[in-house]
Amino acid sequence: METPPPDPVSPPPPAADEGSPGGDDGAEDAGGFSAGLDSLWTALFGSPEELEPMWSPPRGFGVGAEFAAAEVEPEIMDVAGGPWDGAPWRSSGVVAGEGAATALVPPTAAAGFAEFEPAAPIDSYPAGAAAASLGDVPEVSALDSGVDCSPDPPPSSSPPVDFDARGFDPVADSAPAMESPLPPSVASSEANLDGRMLDCTLNSVPSPPLASPYEVGLGAEDPIKDSSPSVAWGTTMDAKDPEVDATCANGTALRRSRRIMKIKSAASSMPLNQNGDSSRASKRRVADSRKSRSSEGSKLPAFTGPISVNTVDLINGVKVQGLQEIVAVENVSSSYDNNQKAGGLYNQVVVALPAASNSLLKDKGASVLPRRKTRLASKVLVNSDRVSAISPVVNGGPPVQKSDVCIPTKKHKLAVEECLTSLDGVDGGGIVLCNSKLKSAKSRVVSKTPQGRGRRSPQPPKTQRARTLSVKYLEKLKRAENNNNNGSMSKSPRVPMIPENNGSMSKSPRVPIIPELSTKHELVLDKHMVDSVMLETDDGSCFFVGDAVPDDEARKQWPHRYEINDQIMKKDKRTSSQTFANAGKAVLDVKCHYLQAKVSRYTFCIGECAFVKGPEGKPNYIGRLLEFFETKTGECYFRVQWFFTAEDTVIGEQAQSHDPRRLFYSDLTDDNLLDCIVSKVTIVQVPPSVDGKSKSVPSSDYYYDMKYSIDYSTFSTIEMEDTDDLMQSCYTSRINDKMKKIDVNKKHKSPVLEKMELSLLDLYCGCGGMSTGLCLGARGGGVNLSARWAIDDDEIACESFRNNHPETRVRNETTDDFLELLKEWEKLCKTYVKHSRTKACVDSTTESNNETPDCSTVPPEEFEVWKLVDICFGDPNKVSKHGLYFKVRWKGYGPHHDTWEPVEGLRNCKEAIRDFVIEGHRQRILPRPGDVDVVCGGPPCQGISGYNRNREFEAPFKCEKNKQIIVFMDVVQFLKPKYVYMENVLDILKFADATLARYALSRLVAMHYQARLGIMAAGCYGLPQFRMRVFLLGCHSKEKLPPFPLPTHEAIVKNGCPLAFERNLVGWPNDTPMQLARPIVLEDILSDLPEVANGESRDEMLYVKGPQTEFQRYIRSFNVEVHGPRAHVTKDSKSSKLYDHRPLVLDNDNYQRILQIPKRKGANFRDLSGVIVGPDNVARLDPTKERVLLPSGRPLVLDCILAYENGKSLRPFGRVWWDEVVGTVLTVPNARMQALIHPAQDRLLTIRESARLQGFPDNYRFRGTVKDRYRQIGNAVAVPVGRALGYALAMAYLKKSGDDPLMLLPPNFAFSHDLRGFA
């Protein structure tokens, strides 16, 4: 059995002598009184015979050195969740007003200690025992209560004092210390012994410190001021058998020993401070005892003032804990008036509770925690848009709920249940506050930022009002506040009042609140503005101002609160919380509403903004106050609508480029206790930026111009409200109704009347999958979106794009050089392009563009610049000299003699440069800022791809392959398009905590673009592959933010999205009936194609079958010549040509291996001869057989195949089957790593079959070698996915989409050409 730790403030007890009762039969470790120390101990404390029983342990404990000098055990966690304080029992304290109980709960034994019966009531003691226990002062015994051997004391000269009139020593920290010295005392060793023994008895069992903020299981409330309804008082009494009285060696009862009685007399007369926490009280007792020792012979005046006793209020489940020999808890009324009338000193005392451990006294005893109310950790914050369990109480303060990452997961219906990755328990049941799921970056200190946003301080700064109030309201409110300072104050029905400054509070003037023009009812402050004290905080009181809103008005204004009360609810007996039978979340039982509240020195009205307590060491939260209400359990709450800082959003640590004063409005609301409010803060709304630059912000603490939604990480513009209208509406709980999306139909002309054509720039275009899909979808929605410019550094991919989009200006250069070229082109246009130039001058230049000069007039020895035909930035001559170059057509020479010349060498050709710039500007050979409507592209992802084994995890931007995201955003910032579409692999959300994705989103928002992030699966839009891609949508602040299109097909999804971005997966909500077609499988796309062999080399061939499925009918119906509005011309597809239907030719060895793969579902390399599979699902060679060799002498089964994924992979040399889908289309077909063998033919899937897997029409042709074509297809965006996004873009541009992040596509969208009838 573990022994209790030694007292942290008492002198060490003397060790037992050999052979003594405490010596453990004379054990060597027990020790004894040293011969040289006997005289010293006798002089200080008395004879060992008298003192030894006091140090004896209680019955049942082991005896010896282990007990005599026990070491403090390290802190351990008890069942309540807090650290063990080193005592056998721990005090849970009392929380007033929360399920209080009048009965005294028996103490609970801590781990490692035996349970004892609770102390018998006082009235149950025999007369002798009662007299002993009810002496002049409360008796305090040491933990080690042994046999009393002291002689009987002489009879008392004074009559016994009645118990009710008996005084107790206050143990507190707030009362002033004794200033007058104690009267001198006679110097004697016995008196000195009394003082030292007093130190032992009083401080050997000090009260524990305040509950640690991390001891959430205690559920205790910190000591409160005089206004608290009840405070625990403690008396100590002997809990042993009252029939047995301990005696000394000479037969005298220990209780009546002379020294002990003197000690009790001195203890009764020692004044201690009041209203202090236990840890400070313990230290004060030490100091007082030392003072008494320093004044020899001093006598302390005894206090015998009356006190009033009351019953202790205990919260349900809280037990009074402590050693039964020393603890008996009673409750003393805290009524100030009653104590004054009785003539007694108003004291709050907690004494003789179990000793605290050294670690607690050392670490936490010196600090005083703020006096604030705490709640049990099992409580649940309720009535929130996103309800979740409360995180542990921070620093003893009330828990603050802010919905962010603690939002319940959403199951997306992308496929049948068995095909989906389970996403249950994303949050793990744990709660991460807003600066959590996402780690918040350290907030920067800005002079304009109020101190309340920074680290919490005990004195929050005083800030301005949250809103600019009307003059009429301000005047009335000022008069009301003035009256409040001198008016009368009525008592709260719950808690006794404390007079403040002996002032009174009078009635406040009537303050009308102007209602909205809708059906909202008027609420007026026509009641007496009286303060009702609710709680105590570190700065003062929290109280409601004014009487409650009348019930009928409150029900009209906040019907959702009172409808809950009228419905049938279940009651949880453990937490006294009420829940719906089918709601699945806790709700608050509201009693009444208020319109104003005061916290500390701030008066808050509904609609004002405030700081709300955040985690310890973290910035406070910011929110708007929507409701003030009291529950039927007597708790006061407020409802808050949150604002997000950039660090609080998904941007996280990538928010360095954002203004620290910029906030983001949100619809997330939560209910919190009233004392969570810290101080006021001023927040203003500013209009959205049109040119991407921040406008001047009015003088305020913060401002906001956008709204943030966790779903799909959406940043959207909100409508700028009139100040007066906003003020009128801010007093209602429906303030969110005023924060509507921008109604662009009212503020802008319809684009149908302005411009039905949009221009697109495709960066990193490849073969054109993304721009092709966007243009097809937009045209289907009624908007003519055309790709005017395309950029890629892959020359072969540029040829494929140019071949299929002849109207597009395709440039083969890097995006970095293209950005520099745009900047130089802008300078040239500003220099040479003048609007005053006549059209005739331009036309004359245009007419001579295609003419060939007369070579006979040019001397053969001279070269003359005839004209400039192109422009680029870079190093076209490969001479390691980057710069601006012009392509020169020499006079007398043809195009094949054109050369690239640097601009420095054309200083004498300003005329030619001017003509080229003017003509290029007219033909828009390069875009200028404002010329581009849509920028799309997918920055290269080799630096983050899972196939790259040399990724930079710690610093992603150190990799040159990852810097293209920066360049992409730089192009957007320069051109300022209306819409932005960026695509990337799913690994961008998995790699390095999604740093690159957060950066891209941060750049868009910093440029005042609306933004939205989503994850789309290709199989959900009519393809037999489960490739998932990330799409970042950006939109100008004055445009409609396009939604994500909902899936059209069930999909067989094999890869799940990252849990941190699970809410970004585009899918059907759980409460919406799905309208999905059956999944598309390989048979739907392959069954009509002619058979080809492994060595097929034809680039063109005819179809041998007609379309067998709806997918085949659609994919073969595109016109060969045009991809415009008439691209869906249907014709006899049997006579049409089929392009690129040839596979990658395998060498003879690999072809021999494919021949031995069976033509059945699931066949792979494990079916080859000589391979066995063990019970561990690992494929290995059969040791009993000789290894099979091919005719070339190489083994049939390669060692690299057996080592791939430790022999557990099923993909090497695998056959796909008719009813299956493929994972993704790779850039390099490799049968050794992927299942790419045709179901019925001994070959790999052809180029055309791979193109169909990506949704390319059959008339889309590719250039380059076979490997080049596979690579282009593998790098492309699936065309059906881009098509769905393009249709949603058209609906947003035409103002036909709603504000929701998702939209429903028309019926049979995947295989229909003409969709304008459904738009």
Swiss-Prot record:
The keyword Chloroplast does not apply. It is an enzyme of class 2 (transferase). Gene3D superfamilies: 2.30.30.490, DNA Methylase, subunit A, domain 2, Vaccinia Virus protein VP39. Transmembrane segments: none annotated. Residues 266-279 have a biased composition (Polar residues). InterPro entries: BAH_dom, BAH_sf, C5-Methyltransferase, C5_DNA_meth_AS, C5_MeTfrase, C5_meth_CS, Chromo-like_dom_sf, Chromo/chromo_shadow_dom. It catalyses: a 2'-deoxycytidine in DNA + S-adenosyl-L-methionine = a 5-methyl-2'-deoxycytidine in DNA + S-adenosyl-L-homocysteine + H(+). Residues 1-34, 142-189, 265-302, 442-468 are annotated as: Disordered. It holds the Pfam family DNA_methylase. It comes from the Eukaryota. Residues 285-296 have a biased composition (Basic and acidic residues). PANTHER family: CYTOSINE-SPECIFIC METHYLTRANSFERASE (PTHR10629), DNA (CYTOSINE-5)-METHYLTRANSFERASE CMT2 (PTHR10629:SF34). This is DNA (cytosine-5)-methyltransferase CMT2.
